[in-house]
Structures are given as structure tokens and as C-alpha cells.
Amino acid sequence: MPEEIKRAARSATASRTTHETDITITVTLDGSGTSSVNSGVLFLDHMLTNFCKHSGFDLELECRGDLDVDDHHSVEDIALVLGSTIAEALGNKRGIGRYGWAIIPMDEALAQCALDLGGRSYCVFNAKFNRPVIQGFSTEMVEHFFISLAGTLKANIHLSILEGENTHHKIEALFKAFAYAMKAAVAITGTEIPSTKGQI
């Protein structure tokens, strides 16, 4: 890692408070994969803990949401705040790899993620799930989580399930593929902003 970039701590904290949720997130990109996640949605906690372990990000997340309604607002708003926090930690993106991709197996499931941190928000999601809910987490919210995150991260994210039957395995493989793709994309590989525009 170039010394002048290495010295700058790539960390950020962001909050969001509405009538539906109260969220605070701190992200450190060059971390050790440690996490303290309390989303109020147990399965989402499990997925975000896995994301940190495999991306190397450190994450502190606290969310109080209207789970008496359902999990939609909490999951959506966590994704929005997480995306904006990572974007802030990236700063001007000087020296980053920008692109990342991974294909990750989990037993019978096989997930693929390719992404670009180039400042353009877009999400393509190809996955179907057999179970509607896992531990309070609506599986339809997996796609919405990544769409919301792509919006505030200003990232182009493509996620697909290539094989699989078990819903837990498929979702976990998607989060792990996203983790490894992000690990590559945020890695410092040079000293320049990786765009012919001169900014991203």
C-alpha cells in the first residue's frame, strides 16, 4: 500500500434517524474483520458478520427499528446508511482497485458477484429463494438490501445465484461473494484515481 494513502485512516461514521428507524454505523475499511452488529434482525446480523469476516472490514452497527411493523424499514435503512458510510470512508477513491469479483460456493449453492465502485449506482440481482422468511428476515429483502446499498455507495453491483436449493446457503453465499468482491475493489493498488475522468 503506498505510504501516503496508507497513513490516511479509511474509516467513517454515519447516522440516520426517522420515525421508522434510528441507525448508527461505523466502518473501517482496512480492519481485521471484527464486527458488533445489532440490527434487530437476527439473520441480517449473521449475514453482516459474515460480510465483515470475509471483506476484512470492521463494522459497528446499532439499529432500533419498527420491527413490530415488519423488517422492511430496518433492512432498507441499514443498507442505505451502510452504503453511504463506506462511500465516505473511501474518500476520493485514489489508488483503489475499483473493480471486484468473486464466485463463492457454499455446499450446493454457488453465488457470483461483480462490482464497480465507479460512482454509478446500479444493481442487477438474479436469485430466487424457496423460503419467505428466515429468523425474522424476509428473503425478498435480500434484493432490496443490495439495491439500496448500491444507491448510496454509488456502485454497480451484479449478484447471481448460479446453483443452489437451500435458501440459507444461497443468501450466505451471496453476502460472502459480495464481501470478497468489495475486499478487492477497495484495496489500495496504486496512487492514481482509477478513471480517465480524473474523478469517480
From Swiss-Prot:
It comes from the Bacteria. It catalyses: D-erythro-1-(imidazol-4-yl)glycerol 3-phosphate = 3-(imidazol-4-yl)-2-oxopropyl phosphate + H2O. Its EC number is 4.2.1.19. PROSITE patterns: IGP_DEHYDRATASE_1 (PS00954), IGP_DEHYDRATASE_2 (PS00955). GO terms for biological process: L-histidine biosynthetic process. GO terms for cellular component: cytoplasm. Keywords: Amino-acid biosynthesis, Cytoplasm, Histidine biosynthesis, Lyase. Its main location: cytoplasm. The keyword Transferase does not apply. GO terms for molecular function: imidazoleglycerol-phosphate dehydratase activity. InterPro entries: IGPD_sf, ImidazoleglycerolP_deHydtase, ImidazoleglycerP_deHydtase_CS, Ribosomal_Su5_D2-typ_SF. It is found in: Cytoplasm. Pathway: Amino-acid biosynthesis; L-histidine biosynthesis; L-histidine from 5-phospho-alpha-D-ribose 1-diphosphate: step 6/9. It is an enzyme of class 4 (lyase). Pfam families: IGPD. HAMAP family: HisB (MF_00076). Belongs to the imidazoleglycerol-phosphate dehydratase family. This is Imidazoleglycerol-phosphate dehydratase. It comes from Pelodictyon phaeoclathratiforme (strain DSM 5477 / BU-1).
